[in-house]
């Protein structure tokens, strides 16, 4: 039996050509694996059949949308995962679930190697290969674009010469990656960081300059997970999809950033994540109501480190798993409702309520009914400022000598 290579298959030109390209370069049989994480487009059966028509000996497709939303997007939400305070890990958080299915397929079909379509200068090569090495240490990895010199021009020529059932003439000027958590756009004229994005860059969001009437939504959370919208129960996937639709219609979630890549270069990226950004804003505000101050301060540090690990392809690392435990513990009391207005590119919190919150009206009010004993303040201030007072006394004494 020939060696087998499992290929992360998208159904597009590059990975369709890679089936035959890998076979000719290595002599191995290719098993195509397509994972649906909410990227839209063609249905899985069409993609599966194309892989077989392009020469794959097996084609495995998986609808991982619910799994992706529940087991990957929700932890990112609970961590308030925003890389460089801006990017909600759109691509980074999808790679581990794809890796999981690639490794499972390799074991199922007896493959010794996993192939992916990443270049040698992006983050995804690291995310895929570190994940594969972790879950399937016996597996080898190859990247046709990086390792077998498969350029787009060669891919077009190969497809035409071999009559592959794939479109070769239409070329999008951008490199696009998308899933239910968001959409990433790069390359083309965007590589000049002075160039403003044009309208054709965007797909998940409408122009916020001319928005429809404001849209008010109430998001209900249990343990940091959205469980209802406007009182209607939803799954995590449904929550993201509905918020994508509603926030996207208002132009919420457009991000334009020069990003520090893992491989050491800076890259200009355009992201659209209407649902993710609105949900993170709502979740963060509910945490303000429900999490104790010192715990909240430390969680921000933990969340930032968690985000960096996921961005860097360390989803399966021991440290990330340990941080998961802390973050999950902080979510115990993150229950309640957030009212939010979506309008003109902004998701603005206008109300919050929680039965497990730490906000005490009687302590906070300045009106009648105030139960805060202000006489305690003087002693607190004296003790709180003691160390600074003593240090200042020392400095003044030394200055006088």
UniProtKB/Swiss-Prot annotation:
Any one cellular-component term (Gene Ontology): cytoplasm
Membrane-traversing stretches: none
Binding site for ATP: 8-16, 117
Location in or out of the cell: Cytoplasm
Positions annotated to bind L-aspartate: 119, 123-124
Parts forming coiled coils: none
Catalytic activity, as annotated: L-citrulline + L-aspartate + ATP = 2-(N(omega)-L-arginino)succinate + AMP + diphosphate + H(+)
Keywords: Amino-acid biosynthesis, Arginine biosynthesis, ATP-binding, Cytoplasm, Ligase, Nucleotide-binding
EC number assigned by the record: 6.3.4.5
Binding site for L-citrulline: 87, 123, 127, 175, 259, 271
GO MF, any single term: ATP binding
Pfam families assigned to the protein according to its UniProt record, in alphabetical order: Arginosuc_syn_C, Arginosuc_synth
GO BP annotations listed: argininosuccinate metabolic process; L-arginine biosynthetic process; urea cycle
Pathway(s) this gene product operates in, as recorded in its UniProt entry: Amino-acid biosynthesis; L-arginine biosynthesis; L-arginine from L-ornithine and carbamoyl phosphate: step 2/3
InterPro entries given in the database record: Arginosuc_syn_C, Arginosuc_syn_N, Arginosuc_synth, Arginosuc_synth_CS, Arginosuc_synth_type_1_subfam, AS_cat/multimer_dom_body, Rossmann-like_a/b/a_fold
Matching CDD domains: ASS (cd01999)
Subunit and partners: Homotetramer.
Entry protein name: Argininosuccinate synthase
């Amino acid at each position: 039996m020939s060696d087998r290579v499992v290929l992360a298959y998208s159904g597009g030109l590059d990975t369709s050509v890679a089936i035959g390209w890998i076979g000719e370069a290595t002599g191995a049989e290719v098993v195509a694996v397509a994972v649906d994480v909410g990227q839209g487009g063609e249905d899985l059966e069409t993609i599966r059949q194309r892989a077989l028509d392009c020469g794959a000996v097996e084609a495995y497709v998986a609808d991982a949308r619910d799994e992706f939303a529940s087991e990957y997007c929700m932890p990112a939400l609970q961590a308030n995962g925003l890389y460089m305070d801006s990017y909600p890990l759109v691509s980074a958080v999808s790679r581990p679930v794809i890796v999981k299915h690639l490794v499972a397929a390799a074991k199922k079909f007896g493959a010794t190697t996993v192939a992916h379509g990443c270049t040698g200068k992006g983050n995804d090569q690291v995310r895929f290969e570190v994940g594969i090495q972790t879950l399937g240490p016996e597996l080898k990895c190859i990247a046709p674009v990086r390792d077998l010199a498969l350029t787009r021009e060669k891919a077009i020529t190969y497809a035409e010469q071999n009559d592959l059932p794939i479109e070769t003439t239409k070329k999008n000027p951008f490199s696009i990656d998308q899933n239910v958590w968001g959409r990433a756009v790069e390359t083309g004229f965007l590589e000049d960081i002075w160039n403003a994005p044009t309208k054709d860059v965007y797909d998940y969001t409408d122009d916020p300059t001319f928005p429809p009437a404001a849209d008010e939504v109430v998001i209900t959370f249990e343990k940091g997970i959205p469980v209802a919208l406007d009182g209607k129960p939803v799954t995590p996937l449904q929550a993201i999809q509905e918020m994508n639709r509603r926030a996207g219609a208002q132009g919420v979630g457009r991000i334009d950033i020069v990003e520090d890549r893992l491989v050491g270069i800076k890259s200009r990226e355009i992201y659209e994540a209407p649902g993710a950004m609105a949900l993170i804003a709502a979740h963060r505000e509910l945490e303000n109501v429900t999490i104790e101050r010192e715990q909240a301060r430390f969680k921000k540090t933990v969340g930032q480190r968690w985000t960096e690990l996921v961005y860097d392809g360390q989803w399966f690392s021991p440290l990330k798993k340990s941080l998961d435990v802390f973050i999950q513990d902080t979510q115990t009391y993150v229950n309640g409702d957030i009212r939010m207005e979506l309008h003109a590119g902004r998701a603005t919190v206008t109300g919050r309520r929680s039965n497990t919150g730490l906000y005490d009206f009687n302590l906070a009010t300045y009106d009648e009914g105030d139960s805060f004993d202000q006489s305690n303040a003087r002693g607190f201030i004296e003790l709180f400022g003691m160390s600074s007072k003593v240090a200042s006394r020392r400095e003044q004494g030394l200055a006088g000598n």
